[in-house]
């Protein structure tokens, strides 16, 4: 039987991500479960250069748009009670969660 749950979280909004991470950590600490993390992973930076003029005539001026994706990993003991509470955590729309039993 798996003894740990690895929770991967990622979002482009770091405030929402930290809010969910704190909820999970506080929930695990209240139940007395061993928690390791949150472990910050490298931030992925995606940049898209877009030409300002749609028709391409004149000087070529570019706008640069970027999006940063922040990632965290939390390892907790996989107890049935904790996993049920984990499913009840309110998650904003811009935070994505993946749970893996290891």
Swiss-Prot record:
Involved in the binding of tRNA to the ribosomes. The gene is rps10. Disulfide bonds: none annotated. Pfam families: Ribosomal_S10. PANTHER family: 30S RIBOSOMAL PROTEIN S10 FAMILY MEMBER. This is Small ribosomal subunit protein uS10. Part of the 30S ribosomal subunit. One of its GO terms (biological process) is translation. Keywords: Ribonucleoprotein, Ribosomal protein. GO terms for molecular function: structural constituent of ribosome; tRNA binding. Belongs to the universal ribosomal protein uS10 family. One of its GO terms (cellular component) is small ribosomal subunit. InterPro entries: Ribosomal_uS10 (IPR001848), Ribosomal_uS10_CS (IPR018268), Ribosomal_uS10_dom (IPR027486), Ribosomal_uS10_dom_sf (IPR036838), Ribosomal_uS10_euk/arc (IPR005729).
